[in-house]
Amino acid sequence: MAGFLATVLICDDEPALRELIRVSLDGRFSFAEAHDGLECLDLARELKPDLVVLDMMMPRLNGLAVLSELRRDEQLAETPVIVLTAQPASRDEAMRSGASRVMLKPFTPDEISAAVEEVLAEAG
């Protein structure tokens, strides 16, 4: 994989959180960012990212709706998705909907970095 950087699509309406994730992973991945659910779906369909980091609570289309659409899309159905949520009760619903992993907010840079590495390794 020399010279190839996996693409991570970061979907969150909070610019500070997108930046935290990007800085945590900088130098090891290429990035695209979306600030709402519809933009996330559009970019996912266009870019076919290696991993999506997806916030549950976003404008225009929430994370569960985005996740359901990704799982229905033949080209994106197997794309690993890490769901971010501040609501512990959302964890089970996200996993049932096809999330690869669910992370509770707040999390540290090391935690998101490790989760991204692990999920990508599991995917393959």
Regions found by a protein language model. Name each.
Residues 82-84:
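Hydrophobic/aromatic residues positioned on beta-strands within the core alpha/beta folds
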Residues 58:
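Receiver (REC) domain active-site loop signature in two-component systems and cognate sites
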Residues 15-32:
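Two-component/phosphorelay signaling modules centered on CheY-like receiver
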Residues 42, 64-77:
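Short amphipathic alpha-helix used as the core "switch/output" element in two-component signaling
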